[in-house]
């Protein structure tokens, strides 16, 4: 790529997986253009950095680009993709561009069905504390950077590895992390065996001198371990793990001791609440230790971690109602987030606004979604965020609400759109409530609307 390609066009440039890559490319001196359907904060940030970005997709947006990079959500019948085909411009997925950036550094790829963004961010905090000056590309806004990415001068590139379309197999890291393996992205994988095969291939791609840092507590990971032919470091709470957390205390923050092969490395104080974040922190420590960072430096890095956007993010308080936002959109993520909410704020009534994400996911995991909200006092449910998918007959937010009522005692109200949900907030919320907005789409705007007093 270096010396041959200078002009890059990115379709879906404002997406969580794309904007970080775009920022690094801009900082490397490439000419970056692109398009997105929405004028988001990410788009505005990239424009300030020098990117030329169109709102809306059109063939006329593709002019003299030397390569077109498309996000996972962009289909091959997109007008800009078709224009690139007609012009003979190479078309690549975002993971292939990420692989090119990683090829120039020592790559560390954080994968798994859940927890990738937080784990990558925690790992970045450790590498920053160690003074390694890493390049970092993640799927959320890291508070320490104020963005999804940074270009460093050091030898390491830390990246969130997206398994959703199998393109994480383009990457060639020296250290992998696998946080968990659950059924998801059924629009691509169709069944558990397909996603298992992808993760097996991913873990076996590390070189013989590399390492897979994997969660030994996760049933999906344990199922795959006999087929992994490369080095493995397991982490978790269980006694069989090589890297373990003990004496765990979780409230609004987390505290635990870390043991490696039985040796006590010290105590971690983490601003992130929840046992799932203890596991994420263990993964980050494992990466740090495997790359030669001292244990005390790893622990200091975690203590200084300032959090990441949309991961149990405390947004503010109004009228005695505390508003928290989280990206969780898979039943397993929802369960972890709700457990954390109960642990952090045991005295508050828990009101959840949930926006399902993708028709295919809602259909495939319908039964799990119906049982996921047993732990809430009030559920506000809206329509499915399509994420470029076509509707599936019989699959909707309303059908999910009906399913929840049939299998649980959850008090659920369905709203066709955000306007209707916002209008119901004054009668729904009361002083002392915890109002949790939950989902990978735009549900966070409902919480912000309430805080703004509109």
From Swiss-Prot:
Native species: Oleidesulfovibrio alaskensis (strain ATCC BAA-1058 / DSM 17464 / G20)
General function of this protein: Cell wall formation.
Protein name: UDP-N-acetylmuramate--L-alanine ligase
NCBIfam families reported in the protein's UniProt record: murC
Entry's Gene Ontology molecular function annotations: ATP binding; UDP-N-acetylmuramate-L-alanine ligase activity
GO cellular-component term (any): cytoplasm
Source taxon at top rank: Bacteria
E.C. no: 6.3.2.8
Pathway where it operates: Cell wall biogenesis; peptidoglycan biosynthesis
InterPro entries reported for this sequence: Mur-like_cat_sf, Mur_ligase_C, Mur_ligase_C_dom_sf, Mur_ligase_cen, Mur_ligase_N, MurCDEF_pg_biosynth, UDP-N-AcMur_Ala_ligase_MurC
Binding residues for ATP: 112-118
Alphabetical list of Gene3D superfamilies matching this protein: Mur ligase, C-terminal domain (3.90.190.20), Mur-like, catalytic domain (3.40.1190.10), NAD(P)-binding Rossmann-like Domain (3.40.50.720)
Single GO BP term: cell wall organization
Coiled-coil region(s): none
Keyword Cell wall biogenesis/degradation attributed: yes
Catalytic activity: UDP-N-acetyl-alpha-D-muramate + L-alanine + ATP = UDP-N-acetyl-alpha-D-muramoyl-L-alanine + ADP + phosphate + H(+)
Family: Belongs to the MurCDEF family.
Cellular location(s): Cytoplasm
One Pfam family, short name: Mur_ligase_C
């Amino acid at each position: 790529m270096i010396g041959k390609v200078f002009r890059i066009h990115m379709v879906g440039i404002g997406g969580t997986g794309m904007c970080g890559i775009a920022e690094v490319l801009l900082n490397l001196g490439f000419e970056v253009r692109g398009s997105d359907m929405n004028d988001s904060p990410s788009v505005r940030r990239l424009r300030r950095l020098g990117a030329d970005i169109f709102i809306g997709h059109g063939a006329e947006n593709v002019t003299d680009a030397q390569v077109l990079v498309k996000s996972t959500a962009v289909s091959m019948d997109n007008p800009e993709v078709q224009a690139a085909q007609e012009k003979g411009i190479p078309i690549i997925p975002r993971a292939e561009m990420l692989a090119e950036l990683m090829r120039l550094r020592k790559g560390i790829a954080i994968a798994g069905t859940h927890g990738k963004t937080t784990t990558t961010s925690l790992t970045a905090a450790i590498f920053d504390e160690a003074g390694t000056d890493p390049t970092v590309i993640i799927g959320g806004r890291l508070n320490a950077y104020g963005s999804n990415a940074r270009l460093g001068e050091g030898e390491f590139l830390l990246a969130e590895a997206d398994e959703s379309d199998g393109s994480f197999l383009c990457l060639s890291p020296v250290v992998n992390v696998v946080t968990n393996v659950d059924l998801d992205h059924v629009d691509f994988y169709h069944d558990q065996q397909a996603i298992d095969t992808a993760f097996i291939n991913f873990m076996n791609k590390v070189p013989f001198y590399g390492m897979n840092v994997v969660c030994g507590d996760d049933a999906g990971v344990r199922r795959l371990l006999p087929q992994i032919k490369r080095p493995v470091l397991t982490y978790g709470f269980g006694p069989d793990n090589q890297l373990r957390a003990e004496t765990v205390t979780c409230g609004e923050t987390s505290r635990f001791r870390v043991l490696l092969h039985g040796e006590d490395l010290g105590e971690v104080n983490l601003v992130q609440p929840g046992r799932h974040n203890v596991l994420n922190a263990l993964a980050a420590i494992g990466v740090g230790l495997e790359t030669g960072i001292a244990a005390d430096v790893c622990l200091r890095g975690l203590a200084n971690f300032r959090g990441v956007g949309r991961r149990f993010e405390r947004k503010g308080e109004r009228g005695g109602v505390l508003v928290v936002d989280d990206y969780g959109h898979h039943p397993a993520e929802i369960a972890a987030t709700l457990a954390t909410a109960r642990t952090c704020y045991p005295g508050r009534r828990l009101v959840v606004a949930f926006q399902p994400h993708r028709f295919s996911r809602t259909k495939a995991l319908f039964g799990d979604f119906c049982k996921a909200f047993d732990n809430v006092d009030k559920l506000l449910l809206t329509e499915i965020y399509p994420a470029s998918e076509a509707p599936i007959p019989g699959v909707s937010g309303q059908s999910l609400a009906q399913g929840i009522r049939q299998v649980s005692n959850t008090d659920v109200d369905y709203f066709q759109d955000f306007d209707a949900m916002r209008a119901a907030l004054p009668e729904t919320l009361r002083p002392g409530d915890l109002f949790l907005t939950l989902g990978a789409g735009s549900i966070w705007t409902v919480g912000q609307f309430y805080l703004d007093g509109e």
